[in-house]
């Protein structure tokens, strides 16, 4: 049974802040910051936007592109690390917001930035087992960075959703490969508002080791090489890391660049690589071969081998594209950024 992507949707907030604006507020060298991360600006959710509202918007567009009725959806899984509620799932809110039946599997998944891709893999299993006809996988985050800390320059906001099924496929997911270990590169304790990163652990032992392990494992099992793929999409904590890991694996820049979005919206965590995939789907031709590798701190990666179908081109314009959302933007200054992020609040009386 062929299983894969029936439809997809995304949501990127309109509000953006230049990394230069943040650097000037803290007295940092804006050019040095830009050269370090290659992130020009990032998306910022408005006061009434959060991972739930973004997940709803992305899922609605995914259903439109899929041509699937809400009543046909048998499961909804949401991957996030920034839930608005400590105890209350996003997935159950999506059931009512999208008009799904009550008889659906629903769960919020957690593994740092790769839970959204875990949601896809779990839905694939349910479809293959004939337990459901279609499922919705969501990656959504409003990423947190402590003011004045370097993470603030790269964390962004956004969501992406994929309808997974076995009919009317825009792209078939032909193979997946996992790679995981106990690596303390990045964490946030329950009582802390902001995460902590393990400095030297964030690069070689975490991001690069796991993405390379998953990508090489997938290619070795399939007997494929970098030149067999038309596109390569990797998790994007900044714009340097995906280009560097591509070079380490042997992928040329022209196969990686189409899927990079972090330079314009920041690292959207669970939506990061999956937004990159959505952008690639907007330009890929039928028969295109795509490798996607997600990454979540702690640490683990999922590698996907995806091949597009003849139905892909007809689905692209059915909903707003990543390209359109990247262009639809309003810039804000740092004071509004702090307000929209609820870092500063008005105290009454």
Curated annotation (Swiss-Prot):
GO terms for molecular function: acetyl-CoA C-acetyltransferase activity; hydroxymethylglutaryl-CoA synthase activity. It comes from Caldivirga maquilingensis (strain ATCC 700844 / DSM 13496 / JCM 10307 / IC-167). It is an enzyme of class 2 (transferase). It catalyses: acetoacetyl-CoA + acetyl-CoA + H2O = (3S)-3-hydroxy-3-methylglutaryl-CoA + CoA + H(+). CoA binds at residue 240. The keyword Transmembrane does not apply. One of its GO terms (biological process) is farnesyl diphosphate biosynthetic process, mevalonate pathway. It holds the Pfam family ACP_syn_III_C. Pathway: Metabolic intermediate biosynthesis; (R)-mevalonate biosynthesis; (R)-mevalonate from acetyl-CoA: step 2/3. Interacts with acetoacetyl-CoA thiolase that catalyzes the precedent step in the pathway and with a DUF35 protein. The acetoacetyl-CoA thiolase/HMG-CoA synthase complex channels the intermediate via a fused CoA-binding site, which allows for efficient coupling of the endergonic thiolase reaction with the exergonic HMGCS reaction. It comes from the Archaea. Its EC number is 2.3.3.10. The keyword Acyltransferase applies. This is Hydroxymethylglutaryl-CoA synthase. InterPro entries: ACP_syn_III_C, HMG_CoA_Synthase, Thiolase-like, Thiolase_N. The active site is at residues 81, 113, 235. Catalyzes the condensation of acetyl-CoA with acetoacetyl-CoA to form 3-hydroxy-3-methylglutaryl-CoA (HMG-CoA). Functions in the mevalonate (MVA) pathway leading to isopentenyl diphosphate (IPP), a key precursor for the biosynthesis of isoprenoid compounds that are building blocks of archaeal membrane lipids. Keywords: Acyltransferase, Isoprene biosynthesis, Transferase. (3S)-3-hydroxy-3-methylglutaryl-CoA binds at residues 29-30, 113, 154, 202, 235, 244, 267, 297.
